[in-house]
């Protein structure tokens, strides 16, 4: 790892602002908020040990604050032992050593908070969910249940344990991936209990405490949970219109021994970004050059509104540098709890042994039904896509009408609208929205760095009448929140 001469990015104002995006959100003096943001970046590995922080005046200019704010923030970090201030040579991030190892247990304890917080929300008392990106079932789930029951009766003479998955389902998944441009054999497919288990298995198999992993920022909350559970040090890379920032990934790979990169190249959750073929090839090459594993999450890949998504990253990789995971929850029904991992056979065997420790194989009835659904995928998926396209347009129209200050880019596929607030905190808004009967996911819950608290992820998976009522409730909550925010500013004044 080349760290003793590293700077925080190339040193330009925009790059620094990108690393500290959202630092000013919240309450308290600016220097306290800046120190907290820098501390979080150091603890999570966004700023590596041995990094020289930007000079005070330059950072102050980039962040549009007074130099005294940066001086006070650096002094606070020095008191905590996170940085050293060297006369004539600037401020440097200290090697964290035992501190980082000691935090592994703490991070593992905290790991489940995001996914549990999402899954523990309920819709009692008539609350409308605008947070869960899980569509209701397609009609074929009910239509094929009787046929699935007959197949289950037939295979019940078998002991029912297939640790790698029900063979006909593995064959159907392999066919589907091959049709997308990634040649796949049944022996390269492991069936999992949803994509979440697939993510957790790859995290447990390939990452240990204190090791570096790169996650997109923002990303799927369940991935943050899974990698924190391992005690890994998370390096966050921003997401643009074409996916994860590969220039920054290249820089990080040159400076740190990164074990794994988690990326969602097809209709990224939550931004809906789509990575072009050239970028997929480039990421595969970067991983191969640096001996780093890429775990690509293709859970949304089949949900393109217009042109199909490019082949998975693994189609451009040599050897075992890319593992592909996916799910049938977003296409057919979340209640199936069927996901999969596609990897070269030696890697897959390792993952299969690890999965057997957990459950000896996923639910057979769900797998039987999933295999039947995949046989009719070319008939079912276009219906699902048309439904989502219509609901996406409706949600966009509702947000524009009832929340006119909010901004978003129209998605080309996937399940969610990534909306930006004109001001305020999405976490605070979520509490007001809940009191008004609408449940939303603040952007900070999608961020390994706790950024994006000025964003809200809004899925368009609900029925049209539910979307309309939910947005109306959210609009009432926004009006109430803005009133609270205005009163608070009058009482507290501007903090400098």
Where are the regions a protein language model picked out?
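Active-site PLP attachment segment
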Residues: 88, 315-350, 362-365, 454
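N-terminal basic, amphipathic alpha-helical segments
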Residues: 1-150, 352, 356-362, 372, ...
């Amino acid at each position: 790892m080349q760290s003793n001469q590293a700077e925080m990015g190339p040193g330009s104002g925009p790059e620094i602002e990108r690393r500290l995006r959202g630092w000013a959100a919240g309450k308290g003096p600016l220097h306290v908020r800046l120190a907290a943001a820098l501390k979080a970046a150091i603890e999570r590995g966004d700023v590596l040990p041995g990094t020289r922080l930007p000079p005070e005046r330059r950072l102050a200019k980039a962040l549009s604050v007074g130099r005294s704010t940066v001086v006070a923030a650096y002094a606070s970090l020095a008191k905590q032992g996170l940085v050293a201030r060297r006369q004539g040579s600037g401020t440097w991030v200290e090697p964290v050593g035992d501190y980082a190892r000691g935090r592994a247990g703490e991070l593992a304890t905290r790991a489940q908070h995001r996914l549990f917080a999402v899954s523990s929300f309920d819709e009692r008392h008539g609350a409308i969910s605008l947070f869960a990106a899980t569509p209701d079932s397609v009609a074929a789930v009910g239509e094929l249940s009787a046929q699935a029951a007959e197949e289950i009766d037939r295979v019940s003479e078998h002991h029912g344990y297939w640790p790698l998955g029900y063979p006909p389902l593995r064959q159907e998944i392999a066919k589907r991936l091959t049709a997308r441009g990634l040649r796949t054999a049944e022996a390269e497919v492991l069936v999992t209990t949803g994509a979440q288990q697939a993510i957790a298995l790859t995290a447990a198999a390939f990452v240990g405490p204190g090791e570096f992993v790169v996650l997109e920022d923002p990303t799927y909350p369940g991935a943050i949970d899974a990698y924190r559970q391992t005690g890994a040090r998370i390096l966050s890379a921003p997401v643009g219109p074409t996916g994860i920032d590969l220039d920054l990934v290249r820089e990080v790979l040159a400076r740190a021994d990164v074990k794994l990169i988690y990326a969602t190249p097809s209709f990224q959750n939550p931004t809906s970004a789509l990575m072009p073929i050239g970028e997929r090839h480039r990421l595969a090459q970067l991983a191969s050059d640096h001996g780093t594993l890429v775990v690509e999450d293709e859970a949304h890949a089949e949900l393109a509104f217009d042109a199909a998504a490019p082949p998975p990253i693994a189609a451009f990789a040599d050897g075992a540098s890319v593992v592909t995971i996916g799910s049938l929850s977003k296409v057919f029904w979340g209640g199936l709890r069927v996901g999969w991992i596609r990897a070269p056979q030696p890697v897959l065997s390792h993952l299969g042994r690890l999965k057997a420790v957990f459950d000896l194989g996923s639910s057979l009835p769900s797998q039987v039904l999933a295999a039947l659904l995949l046989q009719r995928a070319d008939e079912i998926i276009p219906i699902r896509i048309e439904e989502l396209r219509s609901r996406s347009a409706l949600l966009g129209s509702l947000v524009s009408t009832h929340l006119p200050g909010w901004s978003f880019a129209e998605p080309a596929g996937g399940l969610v609208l990534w909306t930006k607030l004109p001001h305020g905190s999405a976490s605070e808004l979520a509490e007001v929205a809940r009191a008004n009967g609408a449940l939303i996911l603040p952007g900070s819950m999608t961020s390994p760095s706790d950024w994006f608290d000025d964003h809200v992820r809004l899925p368009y998976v609900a029925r049209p009448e539910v979307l309309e009522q939910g947005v109306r409730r959210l609009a009432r909550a926004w009006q109430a929140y803005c009133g609270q925010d205005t009163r608070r500013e009058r009482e507290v004044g501007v903090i400098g």
